[in-house]
Regions:
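Catalytic-face loop-and-helix region of soluble metabolic enzyme cores
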Residues: 186-242
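Active-site beta-loop-alpha junctions enriched in small/polar residues
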Residues: 11, 58-62, 95, 122, ...
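Catalytic cores of alpha/beta
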Residues: 124-135, 171-182, 219, 223-242, ...
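Glycine-rich phosphate-binding active-site loops on the catalytic face of alpha/beta enzymes
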Residues: 131-151, 189-196, 235-256
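C-terminal helical cap(s) of enzyme catalytic domains, especially alpha/beta-barrels
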Residues: 206-210, 233, 248-266
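An N-cap/entry alpha-helix motif that binds or orients negatively charged groups
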Residues: 2-70
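Structural recognition of alpha->loop->beta junctions
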Residues: 76-88, 181-193, 236
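N-terminal active-site wall of soluble small-molecule enzyme domains
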Residues: 53-54, 59, 65-167, 173-178, ...
Length: 266
C-alpha cells in the first residue's frame, strides 16, 4: 500500500528547494516582520472552549482521499461564512498538488475576517515557517509523523520566534509521547491515518484521555455531526478541526452554527 504521507513529504522537499531557489531567507524574514500583527490562535480556542466548543473551521477545496470537495471555492466568502457561523479560528490548506490549495487562499481568507488563521500544510523546513508568517499565518501545523524530534523542536522554535502559535498533530501513542516534549499548548489528535488516509473516531476516543492536562486538546478529522463532537468531548476534547463536512454544506454559516449548537458540558 502506498504511504501517502511519505509521497507528500518527498514532494515537499522538492517544493522547499524551489522556494529556496527563488527567494532568500532575508527577503522572507523582512516580509514576515512587516506582516499584519499575529492574532492569538491558542487564545481564541481557550476562550471559546471555556464556554462551549472551540472550532477550527477549515477551507479545503480537495483532498487526496476524497478528490474535489467544493467546486465553488471562494476563500473570502467561505471565511466570512465560518466567522458568521461562530468559528473560533480558520485553517486554510495551502498545498497545491494534493489539496488544490494555494498560499493566496490564506491571504484572501485572513483579509476577509478577524479570526486567527492556521496555515495547513506539511512543514519540514524553517523557510516554510518564515514564509507562513509572511503570508499572514497566525499558527502553523507540525505533523509528528512527518518529523523527527529535533526538527519538530526547531520548527516550533522558529514559529515562536515570529510570534505564531503551533498546532502539534499526533495519530498514535508514540507520537503523543514525542509531542508532549514540545512547548506548544495546542495538541491535536488526528482520527485520520495520514499514511493510509483511513479514518476512525476510535483513535480520538482512545488517545484524547492521555493528553497532558495542561494542553488544549483538539480532535481532528471524521467529524460530521454533533454526536461525533459529543463523543470526542466525552474523551476530553473541547476543540475541533472540521473541514469536509462544512465544506460540503450548501449553507456553510448555518452548518457551522448547527455543529456548534448544544455543546456537551465539560
Amino acid at each position: 500500500m502506498e504511504n501517502v504521507l511519505a509521497t507528500i513529504i518527498d514532494e515537499k522537499h522538492n517544493q522547499v528547494r524551489a522556494l529556496a531557489g527563488t527567494t532568500s531567507f532575508a527577503t522572507l524574514d523582512q516580509a514576515a516582520k512587516a506582516a499584519s500583527p499575529v492574532r492569538g490562535f491558542a487564545a481564541a480556542l481557550a476562550r471559546d472552549s471555556a464556554k462551549g466548543y472551540g472550532l477550527i473551521a477549515e477551507l479545503k477545496k480537495a483532498s487526496p482521499s476524497k478528490g474535489l470537495i467544493r467546486a465553488d471555492f471562494d476563500p473570502a466568502s467561505l471565511a466570512k461564512a465560518y466567522e458568521g457561523g461562530g468559528a473560533s479560528c480558520l485553517s486554510v490548506l495551502t498545498d497545491r498538488k494534493w489539496f488544490q490549495g494555494a498560499p493566496e487562499f490564506l491571504v484572501k481568507a485572513r483579509e476577509a475576517v478577524n479570526l486567527p488563521v492556521l496555515r495547513k500544510d506539511f512543514m519540514i523546513d524553517p523557510l516554510q515557517i518564515v514564509e507562513s508568517r509572511a503570508l499572514g499565518a497566525d499558527c502553523i501545523l507540525l505533523i509528528m509523523a512527518a518529523l523527527d524530534d529535533a526538527l519538530a523542536a526547531e520548527l516550533e522554535s522558529v514559529a515562536f520566534d515570529y510570534g505564531m502559535d503551533v498546532l502539534i498533530e499526533c495519530h498514535d501513542s508514540a507520537e503523543l509521547t514525542r509531542a508532549a516534549k514540545l512547548r506548544s499548548p495546542l495538541m491535536g489528535i488526528n482520527n485520520r491515518n495520514l499514511k493510509t488516509m483511513d479514518i476512525s473516531l476510535d483513535v480520538g476516543a482512545a488517545m484524547l484521555p492521555d493528553l497532558p492536562k495542561d494542553r488544549i486538546a483538539i480532535a481532528e478529522s471524521g467529524l460530521f455531526t454533533p454526536a461525533d463532537l459529543a463523543r470526542m468531548a466525552a474523551a476530553g476534547a473541547r476543540c475541533f478541526l472540521i473541514g469536509e463536512s462544512l465544506m460540503r454544506a450548501d449553507n456553510v454559516a448555518a452548518a457551522t452554527k448547527t455543529i456548534l449548537a448544544n455543546p456537551v458540558a465539560s
